[in-house]
A protein has these predicted regions:
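A short SAM/SAH-binding and catalytic strip from SAM-dependent methyltransferases
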Residues: 31-46
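Conserved class I S-adenosyl-L-methionine
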Residues: 61-99
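A short glycine-rich, Lys/Arg-flanked "PGG" loop and its adjoining helix->strand segment in the class I
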Residues: 46-61
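Short alpha-helix
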Residues: 99-100, 111-134
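Conserved SAM-binding strand-loop segment of SAM-dependent methyltransferases
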Residues: 9-22
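Conserved SAM-binding loop
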Residues: 4-5
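Core SAM-dependent methyltransferase catalytic element
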Residues: 127-129, 147-167
Length: 167
């Protein structure tokens, strides 16, 4: 937070460090809420949706990205390799069994919470949101020529981006 304050010391910005599950902002206090790659680390998505909905103004927008449920389903988040060491296929198992998954990320053991696409979509709908966009990003065509291993990223979705509007 010190670095953020240093980069943008505007008195109009209030920097806080709190767990997402504990945030409690005043109703109708934001026009937009953006979250990047966070919710697969939280057990409950429904609670987040309810709280974000409350703090958004009418017609406010909620935009977020998560690791795609196909990516988080199996847990170890790695390919199954063939006898030559090349990716043979991506394991998708226990997809409908939501809950704790253990993975290695940047050399660290991390705990994630797998959720189905249904959970993300219905969590938004139950909170009162109208989904306006849903995207499963793919590598740009130019990357496929310059970074050959990116071709494997066309074999399964890794990320999910959703935008929703408060009704």
């Amino acid at each position: 937070l010190d670095k953020a304050r240093e980069i943008n010391p505007s008195p109009l910005i209030e920097y806080k460090r709190i767990a997402i599950e504990d945030f409690d902002f005043a109703p109708n206090s934001f026009d937009i809420v953006i979250s990047s790659l966070t919710f697969h680390y939280l057990e409950s998505f429904d609670k987040v949706c309810t709280e974000v909905y409350k703090c958004l103004t009418q017609e406010g927008v909620f935009v977020f990205s998560v690791e795609h449920p196909v990516f988080t389903a199996y847990g170890n988040q790695d390919w199954i390799y063939d006898s030559e060491g090349k990716p043979a296929h991506w394991p998708v198992d226990h997809y409908f069994q939501e809950g704790v998954r253990h993975a290695r990320f940047l050399g660290e053991d991390v705990t994630k919470y797998h959720k189905t696409l249904t959970t993300y979509v219905n969590g938004l709908i139950k909170a009162g949101f109208c989904i306006t966009h849903l995207v499963e990003p793919q590598p740009d065509e130019s990357m496929l020529d310059t970074v050959p291993e990116m071709r494997d990223e066309l074999r399964r979705p890794m990320m999910l981006l959703i935008a929703a509007r408060k009704n």
